[in-house]
């Protein structure tokens, strides 16, 4: 069964405040929509991820794409949630998919176990949603007075993602016309269909009010860890016109020898970022045996590592590079190196440090045979 995740991100979210649609507000360093997408992008169960957006939010979507370093499959939404979902379903149909999971962009804490429950239930049911039993006492009220109690027996709170076989859901939407209903399960019910339930997750709450965002910030903090990555690289020194080091061109009669541009500073930094992401080392991603990387600028290696870090929910917060060599002298180039590394990583310059040292004439660096670089990065990672 080929499944699409359809993310409904066309709403305005005015009750949450903040001046921008809530899916584009910052939460723990990332956009809310970025958090939501990160919960889905790593799951191989999805053959496609479709994001339904408001055409007025093009700049916001571009910012999310830049944050994730991917191109999203977006479709314009409509005036109501029902119309927006219909647009997403039509896109899934055009892609030849069999089923959909429709999810609110403002539910950034979707868990893997819930996705697994929905996929399993789809094998036996054409429509299935997550739900939580109502736990609070209920009563009717009005004019600031408490009325009659309402039994909680059999009452549930619906969540998303809501999962459906695509063909019957499209038929239900065709019968619906322009009527607006609160969710997709209601569309199936209005067409006479049945909807199965699986247990939801209390953490999978929707961001609607300022209080919800305050709760979400606390949850993000509880799910965020600080990680470090370390990298080390060495290249041989030989007479040459140009040396590339920390992304800066240096003309000191020496060059670093290697398969790519041999920028030991950026190579060490790339390995450090890959380490923070748990993504191996530079040789795995850019093997020196591959001719396409011969003479390549090391900028591309670092940007790839940062992309992988973002894709696992990581955010780089600090980078420290130590260059170990008798020559060339690093001092005259330190500021340019710092600025270039800050530009490549997206960090402010105050969170980038370039240090230099020697080995007091000892070893291969002391003899001027080579240059070594060590890098350590700090990153925040949402677990």
Swiss-Prot record:
2-C-methyl-D-erythritol 2,4-cyclodiphosphate synthase: annotated segments: 227-383
Site (Transition state stabilizer): 15, 22, 259, 358
Entry cofactors: a divalent metal cation
CDD domains in the cross-refs: CDP-ME_synthetase, MECDP_synthase
UniProt entry tagged with the keyword Transferase: yes
SUPFAM superfamilies: IpsF-like, Nucleotide-diphospho-sugar transferases
UniProt-annotated binding residues for a divalent metal cation: 233, 235, 267
InterPro entries reported for this sequence: IspD, IspD/F, IspD/TarI, ISPD_synthase_CS, MECDP_synthase, MECDP_synthase_CS, MECDP_synthase_sf, Nucleotide-diphossugar_trans
GO molecular function list: 2-C-methyl-D-erythritol 2,4-cyclodiphosphate synthase activity; 2-C-methyl-D-erythritol 4-phosphate cytidylyltransferase activity; metal ion binding
Chain intervals for the UniProt region annotation (2-C-methyl-D-erythritol 4-phosphate cytidylyltransferase): 1-226
Catalytically driven reaction(s): 2-C-methyl-D-erythritol 4-phosphate + CTP + H(+) = 4-CDP-2-C-methyl-D-erythritol + diphosphate; 4-CDP-2-C-methyl-D-erythritol 2-phosphate = 2-C-methyl-D-erythritol 2,4-cyclic diphosphate + CMP
Positions of 4-CDP-2-C-methyl-D-erythritol 2-phosphate binding: 233-235, 259-260, 281-283, 357-360, 364, 367
One record GO biological process: terpenoid biosynthetic process
Function: Bifunctional enzyme that catalyzes the formation of 4-diphosphocytidyl-2-C-methyl-D-erythritol from CTP and 2-C-methyl-D-erythritol 4-phosphate (MEP) (IspD), and catalyzes the conversion of 4-diphosphocytidyl-2-C-methyl-D-erythritol 2-phosphate (CDP-ME2P) to 2-C-methyl-D-erythritol 2,4-cyclodiphosphate (ME-CPP) with a corresponding release of cytidine 5-monophosphate (CMP) (IspF).
Family: In the N-terminal section; belongs to the IspD/TarI cytidylyltransferase family. IspD subfamily. In the C-terminal section; belongs to the IspF family.
Stored PANTHER family: 2-C-METHYL-D-ERYTHRITOL 2,4-CYCLODIPHOSPHATE SYNTHASE, CHLOROPLASTIC (PTHR43181:SF1)
Protein name: Bifunctional enzyme IspD/IspF
Protein source organism: Maricaulis maris (strain MCS10) (Caulobacter maris)
């Amino acid at each position: 069964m080929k499944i699409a995740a359809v993310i409904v991100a066309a709403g305005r979210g005015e009750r949450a405040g903040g001046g921008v649609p809530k899916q584009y507000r910052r939460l723990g360093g990332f956009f809310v929509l970025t958090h939501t997408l990160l919960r889905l992008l790593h799951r191989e169960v999805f053959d496609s991820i479709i994001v339904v957006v408001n055409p007025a939010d093009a700049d916001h979507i571009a910012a999310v794409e830049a944050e994730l370093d991917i191109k999203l499959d977006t479709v314009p939404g409509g005036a109501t949630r029902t119309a927006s979902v219909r647009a997403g379903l039509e896109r899934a149909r055009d892609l030849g998919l069999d089923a959909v999971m429709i999810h609110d962009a403002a539910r950034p804490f979707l868990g893997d176990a819930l996705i697994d429950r929905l996929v399993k239930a789809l094998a036996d049911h054409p429509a299935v949603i997550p739900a939580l039993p109502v736990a609070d006492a209920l009563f009717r009220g009005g004019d600031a007075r408490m009325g009659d109690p309402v039994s909680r027996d059999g009452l549930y709170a619906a969540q998303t993602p809501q999962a459906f076989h695509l063909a019957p859901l499209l038929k239900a939407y065709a019968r619906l016309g322009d009527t607006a209903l609160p969710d997709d399960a209601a569309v199936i019910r209005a067409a006479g269909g049945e909807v199965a339930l699986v247990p939801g997750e209390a953490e999978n709450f929707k961001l609607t009010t300022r209080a919800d965002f305050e709760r979400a910030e606390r949850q993000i903090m509880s799910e965020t860890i600080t990680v470090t990555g370390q990298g080390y690289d060495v290249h041989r020194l030989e007479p040459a016109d140009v040396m590339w080091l920390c992304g800066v061109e240096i003309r000191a009669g020496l060059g670093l020898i290697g398969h790519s541009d041999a920028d030991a500073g950026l190579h060490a930094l790339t390995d450090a970022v890959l380490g923070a992401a748990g993504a191996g080392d530079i040789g795995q991603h850019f093997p020196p045996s591959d001719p396409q990387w011969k003479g390549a600028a090391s900028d591309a290696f670092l940007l790839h590592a940062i992309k992988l870090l973002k894709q696992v929910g990581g955010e780089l917060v600090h980078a420290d590079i130590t260059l170990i060599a008798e020559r060339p002298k690093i001092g005259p180039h330190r500021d340019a190196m710092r600025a270039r590394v800050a530009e490549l990583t997206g960090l402010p310059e105050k969170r980038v440090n370039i240090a230099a040292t020697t080995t007091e004439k000892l070893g291969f660096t002391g003899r001027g045979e080579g240059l070594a670089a060590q890098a350590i990065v700090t990153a925040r990672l949402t677990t």
